[in-house]
Amino acid sequence: MRILGIEGTAWAASASVFETPDPARVTDDDHVFIETDAYAPDSGGIHPREAAEHMGEAIPTVVETAIEHTHGRAGRDGDDSAPIDAVAFARGPGLGPCLRIVATAARAVAQRFDVPLVGVNHMVAHLEVGRHRSGFDSPVCLNASGANAHILGYRNGRYRVLGETMDTGVGNAIDKFTRHIGWSHPGGPKVEQHARDGEYHELPYVVKGMDFSFSGIMSAAKQAVDDGVPVENVCRGMEETIFAMLTEVSERALSLTGADELVLGGGVGQNARLQRMLGEMCEQREAEFYAPENRFLRDNAGMIAMLGAKMYAAGDTIAIEDSRIDSNFRPDEVAVTWRGPEESVDSYRMGGDEVQGAEATVHFDGDRVIKVRVPRSYRHPTLDERLRTERTRQEARLTSEARRNGVPTPLVRDVDPQESRIVFQRVGDTDLREGLSEGRVADVGRWLARIHDAGFVHGDPTTRNVRVGGRDEQADRTTLIDFGLGYYTQEAEDHAMDLHVLAQSLAGTADDPETLLSAAEDAYRTESDHADAVFASLDDIEGRGRYQ
């Protein structure tokens, strides 16, 4: 099989030829050729008009170069009249003017050789190239690119967004900082270079469940430079903060799903510090990590051709009249036809006396639970100590506060912030994700309403952080645990964020997430004194994810 791939979502005009006897796996006979002509603005960031002009000039050239590459290679059954089996192109997400040029070129080549057309989601291609080349079965994927940052996991025929940026993409955030200090695009490599000579400078650390935000970090970083902090120190602080956030949410996704494989995608993934952090985190929790080589991390047509081959083999092609582009094409909108419905990132099984959570080790000792936030070697020591100490104190405080407000939580028996250690009463038989039901999820909605009315949030109300079960009449009892990301707030938006995190965790772990979420929301409305304001904020939050 030989597939021509065409990429041009923003800055990289790229074409590729992917040859393989089996698109489902890596073979010794695989061959990938990539030709790329990257747009580089004279100053500032990417300008859509200039980028489109570049695509108009460069796409025909890189496509012809890729087609010429097929000449001299083995034809199909001795017939060289059509040197490719299909044309795959990036339908989105991306800049509309650039995408239209790519789509036009793809249609022209498909008609020229009378071969099928395959429309590929750019972000899913970032994921699939890592899954393909790693040989992993069903990994969690961190996509860290210019306009995007999200955590994906496969379940029930689609890639589910387990977490994502709530404002700007990670690469764009870094570029905004570098433009502020007069550095040219792209800014990421320059930040990486200067960070090597810098000392850690503290910046805001924003993780909410498995979502994250970068705008506050960038504002603080720009202000720090303006205030005279050495730029090398600010760059070091940016790397240590942003990449620790991405690594933490990746670990939270592994913990939520029980997966033991992680792949990295996206151009920001070329950063060596980020790769080391992710590798250390996975090693610490005995998971496998894979980062493709750089030519497959940055925007490239090779990943488009590889995913195109999988889709073509599954019969997932489109007619030319249906091949319109979608500049807001979210990865969770893609019907994943090339994977079996029985596959899932969901492999979690509870068992044993010790459990590795997202940021702590939990040991069961009779009627006690001993939770220790062990040091995370991937984080800068100063940042790591601050987070572990703050979260230990906050968890103990809010667990007791929730209990005083009528929410079932375990008794706190001992706290040692210096050792990041808490001893709790043991509650429940298993996690909610192992015993999902409408009634139990409705209880979670009810408990969240009570703590919100009391003036604080849970911070991470996933199906891993609710214990269920008990003896006799308490068999359906639900108990909230792990308030480490919680904080005091009266803001409706902060309360809505709890509901958003719950919704994401249900999407990643439940077979019928919509029904379960409705049960939680109905119970919340009944219990809360401020439901209207909270749900208005929730609508706003859900419109902020990339390409909503």
Curated annotation (Swiss-Prot):
GO molecular function, one term: zinc ion binding
Keyword Acyltransferase part of the UniProt annotation: yes
Enzyme's top EC category: transferase
EC number, as in UniProt: 2.3.1.234, 2.7.11.1
InterPro entries: ATPase_NBD, Bud32, Gcp-like_dom, KAE1/TsaD, Kae1_archaea_euk, Kinase-like_dom_sf, Peptidase_M22_CS, Prot_kinase_dom
UniProt keyword terms in alphabetical order: Acyltransferase, ATP-binding, Cytoplasm, Iron, Kinase, Metal-binding, Multifunctional enzyme, Nucleotide-binding, Serine/threonine-protein kinase, Transferase, tRNA processing
Localization of this protein: Cytoplasm
Free-text comment on the cofactor: Binds 1 Fe(2+) ion per subunit.
Region (Disordered): 390-413
Matches recorded under SUPFAM superfamilies: Actin-like ATPase domain, Protein kinase-like (PK-like)
Needed co-factor(s): Fe(2+)
Function of the protein: Required for the formation of a threonylcarbamoyl group on adenosine at position 37 (t(6)A37) in tRNAs that read codons beginning with adenine. Is a component of the KEOPS complex that is probably involved in the transfer of the threonylcarbamoyl moiety of threonylcarbamoyl-AMP (TC-AMP) to the N6 group of A37. The Kae1 domain likely plays a direct catalytic role in this reaction. The Bud32 domain probably displays kinase activity that regulates Kae1 function.
Quaternary structure note: Component of the KEOPS complex that consists of Kae1, Bud32, Cgi121 and Pcc1; the whole complex dimerizes.
Family of the protein in this entry: In the N-terminal section; belongs to the KAE1 / TsaD family. In the C-terminal section; belongs to the protein kinase superfamily. Tyr protein kinase family. BUD32 subfamily.
Entry protein name: Probable bifunctional tRNA threonylcarbamoyladenosine biosynthesis protein
Species name: Haloarcula marismortui (strain ATCC 43049 / DSM 3752 / JCM 8966 / VKM B-1809)
